[in-house]
Amino acid sequence: MKINNKEYTIPELSFNAMCKLEDMGVNFADMEKKTLSTVRGFLALAMDGNLDKAGTELEKHLASGGNIEEVVTEIGKEVEESGFFQALKSQ
């Protein structure tokens, strides 16, 4: 995902990555209700777990006219295509 002209790569969304997101406060049942926290968590995952740095980058991104919906769409695509969620859907 591109934030402030920097490209961040969300790591493979494995079981362990999902646990890290939960440890950072990203609750998959509340993803639609807590969009900003979810986006910050995924960006932090791409930034070695630094929630404060991720929040600062997102704030700068929005202040400079960046679009949060594009980031949300990209995260949704990554989640849907992850092997972890594919396995869950097939159960």
Model-assigned labels for residue ranges:
Residues 36-37:
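Amphipathic alpha-helical repeat elements characteristic of tetratricopeptide repeat
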Residues 2-7, 15-16, 23-33, 49-91:
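Charged interaction scaffolds used for protein-protein
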